[in-house]
Amino acid sequence: MPSTRNIEKLNDSNPTLRTLSLSALGIVYGDIGTSPLYTFKTVILLAGGGTPDVNTIMGSVSLIIWTLIIIASVKYISFALRIDNDGEGGILALMSLLSLKLKHRPFIIAVGLMGAALIYGDGTITPAISVLSAIEGLEILSPSLKYYVLPIAITILITLFAIQSKGTATIGKAFGPVMAFWFLTIGILGARGVIQHPFVLAAINPVYGLNFLFSNGATGFFILCGVFLCVTGAEALYADLGHFGTAPIRCAWFGLAFPSLIFNYLGQAALVLEGASTEHNIFYMLCPSDFLLPLIILSTVATIIASQAIITGAFSMTRQAMQLGWLPRLRVTQTSSEGYGQIYIGVVNWFLMLATLGLTIGFGSSEKLAAAYGIAVSATMLCTTVLLFIALHKLWKWNIITSGLVAGLFMIVDASFFAANLTKFINGGYIPITLAIIIYSMMYIWHKGYKTIAIKQKEKNITVDSFLDSIQKEGVVRVPKTAVFLTSKEQDIPPILVWHVKKNRVLQDKVIILNINNLSIPWCKPADQLQIVETGAGIWHAVANYGFMEQPHIPKLLKKLEAQGYDINIKDITYYIGHETIFVRNVRHTMSKYIKILFVFMHRNALPMSNYFHLPPESVFEIGRQIEI
């Protein structure tokens, strides 16, 4: 993975910057880049449809342009990208950074987790609305083809999710060039419309948007629901910071994506000013009829790429949440050795597929899906703005007035969009919100239950001296082997080691008590990844440090000890891990009974520790324990 700090040193003539910028077009800008397929059409529909007047057209496109400027260009590109957690971006990385360095952790964590949960909620809609809006171009080609739109969209989505386990590293190399061609195409089509009606360029003046917003009462307010669709993919600009760095993301945005989007929206507005019908997708009406089918194919490919970015982002965010202790262990499969971000999480993939297909079939068209789309993303952006304000004031040391003025502008814009999108709640907006609440509850329950178990285990801590005294008094036999006892918490002597000695009356002459420590930073320096101290009598205490973007692999880590001259044979190690059986009594302790029951269910279905840490099955002993909560 390229370091952000190194990328910042690149200049415009550096081929690495150009390569990374091209790649960023394929990963970062897929969602926001395909928004022209449905945004302007939705805005005009919310404004009353039919034949809109000049003020409506100019005001609508002006609002879209300035939303792209304020939210995408200023908030995310100019500010958010500068606040990274050791090179990583996104709301979970920002939450971890702030909670690590500041007080008021419960508030920061609550805001960050809710923002992350909301991303999952709207992430189920993005593939559905994107693919449907692309395939709906067939209706312009021939009205009789409208009956094939839904089956084709469903087939594409099923195929997309089905191939995830195989990895997308090979075809992923084409994402950047394809999206570059996509942006060039929509930019040229838009410019063609602008040339036909250059008056539309006046919409760059924000006065048109403000006049329309404040002079049309409820209509001006409701239209913000449609306007917001142009930036639903803006959160990806920040979330993918660690993959590319600030410079390539900015270069791709200002060099191609942003001007192409502006021209396309202006071109669609120009077309409607010329009297084009708003009954069909305005985006496709920019294209000459001879090139309509190739454009539909290109649009479909672009929306598939946008959907792939959403799926990959969900995998990455899930891994972050697991490493930070907010979700149970899930099976993570590395699908390519070429990139750390090439992973697959089956549970997440099939959850997204079922939810996306359900929404696609249930709503049936991009127009109806737009009624449910945006509410969760607008709430996520509010959460990000709250954390940005804290970062500006506490990390950048800006005074509270300056921080408030900058964040206040973003807050006003974000709150306006969120308030407008709340009107979608009954029409389908409740779906992503409900999903977000479920996921947030899962994260809260898992973390709460995990802390409860940790407290109970800590109460039974045994010191090294007392343990050594006991094995000497009881005449425990030491055998020439190496044993590794894994524990998730720092303990002098973990319960599984005590149990092993009591039951077997034998102990290996080399014992490593390995504590897995998940850090609140994305990556741990290789020199700091493994720390080991000998406590005497052949017992070592070791700490394995992993960042929230890293996948633990214990055998590989222990090879470092062998390479450093420690007297251990990696092929002759026996791993001891605890297998807790959690049960609930009708006694109230730190968790309500129903929360406890849900935690027990999640715990039983979590991936076994041996699988998660890549331990060789033939060398693992699981020691069962019952824990009451």
From Swiss-Prot:
Q: Does the keyword Transport apply?
A: yes
Question: What compartments host this protein?
Answer: Cell inner membrane
Sorted alphabetically, the Gene Ontology cellular component annotations on this record are: plasma membrane
Question: Where are its TM segments located?
Answer: 20-40, 61-81, 106-126, 143-163, 171-191, 212-232, 253-273, 291-311, 343-363, 372-392, 400-420, 425-445
Stated membrane topology is: Multi-pass membrane protein
InterPro entries, per database record: K+_transporter, K_trans_C, K_trans_N, Kup
Q: What keywords sit in the KW lines? A: Cell inner membrane, Cell membrane, Ion transport, Membrane, Potassium, Potassium transport, Symport, Transmembrane, Transmembrane helix, Transport
Q: Does the keyword Cell membrane apply?
A: yes
GO molecular function terms listed in the Swiss-Prot or TrEMBL record:
potassium ion transmembrane transporter activity; symporter activity
Q: Record's family? A: Belongs to the HAK/KUP transporter (TC 2.A.72) family.
Concerning PANTHER family, the annotation shows:
K+ POTASSIUM TRANSPORTER (PTHR30540:SF83), OSMOTIC STRESS POTASSIUM TRANSPORTER (PTHR30540)
* Free-text function comment from the UniProt entry: Transport of potassium into the cell. Likely operates as a K(+):H(+) symporter.
Name of this chain's protein: Probable potassium transport system protein Kup 3
